[in-house]
Each structure stands twice: as structure tokens, then as C-alpha cells.
Amino acid sequence: MSDSERTSLPLVFDEPRGRKKPPRHLADLAPDERTAYAKELGLPGFRAKQLSTHYFSRLVDDPDQMTDLPAGQRAELVAGLLPGLMTPLRTMEADRGTTRKTLWRLFDGALVESVLMRYPDRATMCVSSQAGCGMACPFCATGQGGLQRNMSTAEIVEQVVAGARSLARGEVPGGPGRVSNVVFMGMGEPLANYKAVLGAVRRLTDPAPDGLGMSARGVTVSTVGLVPRMRQLADEGIPVTLALSLHAPDDELRNELVPINTRFSVAETVEAAWNYAKVTKRRVSIEYAMMRGINDQAWRADLLGDVLRGYGDWGWVHVNLIPLNPTPGSKWTASDPADEREFVRRLEAKAIPTTVRDTRGREIDGACGQLAATEA
């Protein structure tokens, strides 16, 4: 890899100071906090439960449909607990309408994207957790855009609720349905926005009507390897799936592809992933974007297998190979299919379960690593 191909962006862990915060929303709050907040606004506490039912269970966004609320108070209640957070600017479709990428403008003008993917047996929502990203991975369009700000818990949840509405209303081919899976693999490094992401996970998994009532097993949180946060997440008691974006099994290459590796080595990062599996009893997914001539050599497959096998073969890990998706100006390309097959063969020879990701939304820049949130 030449010097011109390497990232020159710094790692950024904290959002810029002084940014105005999004409006406070029901989804930012735990159930007991909602009741207290309603009372702060001079409203009866039980109204918070009614609004939670409309938002999370009925997926209502029209105050006129909230007929159990006094007509004279609806506007006040909605403005106080369900303020508008995001405006859809554009929705693009692929895969005969079953993949939908939405560009959102947040209250302060920041742009983010989410992707809804419907399959015959499930519907997955890929959500953003930050506007931009500070992890500076050179092959990722989001990382090359830098970090604008963290998203709030409610802004994250609203992406899922909006997708759930689209499915419930039959707007996606296949008839009415529901969101079964959520992956934090959109824009941003989820564990760099830890508090808001954890709050969103709790809202997604809280039983209805306090939340969406999803199974924690249907939620995947990705990370490039913020080791202290990986350890913290393991102790939260929420058995979500952890996906580690590894992309290289050796420090020399990973330092270039995933700059956080200069802070936390491959050994430290994989050990934290193993610890997550040990504590939660949930299998960890190792994400590995296949780049032609960069990280797809057979010897690297062997090394990856050895690194993972070093922590035992008790089913703690699974490798998910991702054909590299093109991004504007990128000098990297996807691996040759023959090299990809050999990579899989070598990992499986070391008893590492391995799959190649079904790439959805590539033609609408909605696939892994392509989200850049531009209005162009």
C-alpha cells in the first residue's frame, strides 16, 4: 500500500464541543423518566405511557390518530414528548424495492443515512449512530468524511421506528411486516457514542409498549475495536451480538486499514472480543472486508485462523467476509472470487465458521462502507 493510499485523517473520539443538543424525546428516556418528564411539562404522568404505546406499539406519527388523548392537549403532548427529530430528504431503492436507503436531515442540518433490507424470512434495519465517523478507516466513505457529531438515543431509535412504519404500512414489497433485526453498521462508530447507543439498544429491547420489544439476539452492535467499551458492553447484561471489524490479522496491515489499531493491537482487540463471547455466551462476528492484493492473501487467511483458534474452538467466533464495496476515489477493489473462495477454504480448514456476506444496496451506495450522506 503506497503512502498516497493511506489515511491522513486523525482519529477523533469526541464530538465537537458546543453543538446544540437535539430536542428531548420520549425515546431518550427510560419509562420512569418519561413519567417524571411529563409531570415536569405540567402534564399527567400517565400520558407518557399513552404516548409510548402510540410511538412504539402502534407506530403512529399523526396526532389526529391518538384519539385517547384529549383533543385540546394533543399538540402540546406531542410537542413535549414526541418532537420532530429527523426529516426524510430522499429514499432510494434497489433489489426490486426490498432494499431502501433513506437520507435524513437532523434538526441541526446534519445528514445521516439508514438502510432497510427485507428478506423472505426477516427484515433488517441498518442504522447510523453518528453523523460521520472519527475512526478514519481509509477504505470507508463514512470514515473519510470525518465526525460531525454523535446522534441522540432518540435519533437512533427513530430510524428503526420509521422503518417499522414502512413495513407495517405495506410500503415495502412483500406485504405488511415488522423489523426483526437491527444492525449498528451504518454511519459512525457505535462504541464511540456509547451512552446513546446503549440507550437505543434498551429502547429496542424494552418490552412493548415501553420499547419495541425486540429480542436482544436480533440486535448487532459493530465496532472497529474500542477495547475498553467492548469490555464494558460485555458487563451490561444485554446479550446483543458483537461484530468486530477486524479486516486484517496482523498489526502492520491493520494499523493502516483500521487506525484505531495503533491504540489497541490485534491481540488486545481479539482478546476483548473473546471476553465478550465468554461473558455473554453470544458468538462474536469477525467482519473482514476483502480487498484485492491487500488483505486477501492465503497466508493471511491462515494467520487469521490461527489468531482466532488461539482462544479455543468452543464456537465463540464466526467470520463474515465482505466483498469490498466501491467508494468514490478509492484505489481498492474487491478480491478476485477465486481468492475469496480460497480464503474461505483455509479458514474452514481450521474449523472457523465462515460466510460471505450477501451485499445489498451496492448500486444505491447503501452497502457496507458506502454511506456518505450527501444530497448530491
Curated annotation (Swiss-Prot):
The active site is at E113, C368. Residues 119-362 form the Radical SAM core domain. InterPro entries: Aldolase_TIM (IPR013785), Methyltransferase_A (IPR040072), RNA_MTrfase_RlmN (IPR027492), rRNA_lsu_MTrfase_RlmN/Cfr (IPR004383), rSAM (IPR007197). GO terms for cellular component: cytoplasm. S-adenosyl-L-methionine binds at G188, E189, S222, S245, L246, H247, N325. Belongs to the radical SAM superfamily. RlmN family. Specifically methylates position 2 of adenine 2503 in 23S rRNA and position 2 of adenine 37 in tRNAs. This is Probable dual-specificity RNA methyltransferase RlmN. It catalyses: adenosine(2503) in 23S rRNA + 2 reduced [2Fe-2S]-[ferredoxin] + 2 S-adenosyl-L-methionine = 2-methyladenosine(2503) in 23S rRNA + 5'-deoxyadenosine + L-methionine + 2 oxidized [2Fe-2S]-[ferredoxin] + S-adenosyl-L-homocysteine; adenosine(37) in tRNA + 2 reduced [2Fe-2S]-[ferredoxin] + 2 S-adenosyl-L-methionine = 2-methyladenosine(37) in tRNA + 5'-deoxyadenosine + L-methionine + 2 oxidized [2Fe-2S]-[ferredoxin] + S-adenosyl-L-homocysteine. It is found in: Cytoplasm. The keyword Nucleotide-binding does not apply. It comes from the Bacteria. One of its GO terms (biological process) is rRNA base methylation. It is an enzyme of class 2 (transferase). PROSITE patterns: RADICAL_SAM. Pfam families: Radical_SAM (PF04055). It comes from Nocardioides sp. (strain ATCC BAA-499 / JS614). Transmembrane segments: none annotated. Reaction proceeds by a ping-pong mechanism involving intermediate methylation of a conserved cysteine residue. [4Fe-4S] cluster binds at C133, C137, C140.
